[in-house]
Amino acid sequence: MILLAKTETKIQSSAQEAYQLLVNMERFGEWFPDVITIKSVNELAHGEVGKTYLETVSIPLIGNRKIKLRVAEAIRNQRIVTEGNLIPILPRMDIFIAELNEHEILVKWSMFSRSPNKLVQLLLLPSVKRLMQQRADIASVRLKQLLEQ
């Protein structure tokens, strides 16, 4: 996997409160830029492995694209991993929540590409990295504001 972007943010919140927000991908657009819509497409609970969503996201020079997201891993109050079917990037989002003390957490957010294609890695991913890091930086500020309000 190729790292596209990452952030680490200290937030005045409990791990449980943060997890409840983060695991509900229908709320992803509240804090992550350029998410137009995101909706559940199966009856599994948020955070359950196999839970699936359909996300509409804005992509520069392309417009809006629909991406199918699936919860690949989840550990209650600690970690959420989703994988998307956006070809050729094949994104994987990994969110880790660490309790620093009773009232403060550290949220580590990372986005990876699962693409094995060397041309994609060489030609496309450098620009995707810049875009995703910009979005991630905005998202970390928004997430902090949302959880601390």
What residue spans do the PLM features occupy?
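Beta-strand/loop substructures that line and gate deep hydrophobic ligand-binding cavities in soluble
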Residues: E83-Q134
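Generic structural detector for well-ordered beta-strands
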Residues: E8-Q12, K39, T56, R70, ...
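A short, compositionally biased micro-patch
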Residues: W31, A74-I75, L100
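Hydrophobic ligand-binding cavity/cleft-lining segments
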Residues: M1-L44, E48
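Hydrophobic pocket/interface hotspot
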Residues: E17-L22, F28, Y53, V71, ...
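Intrinsic-disorder/low-complexity, polar/charged segments enriched in Ser/Thr/Lys/Arg/Asp/Glu/Gln
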Residues: I2-E8, T52, K66, R79, ...
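Beta-strand elements of well-folded, non-transmembrane domains
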Residues: I11-S13, I59-L61, E73, S113-S115
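Glycine-rich portal/gate segments that line the openings of hydrophobic small-molecule binding cavities
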Residues: S40-I89, I138-Q149
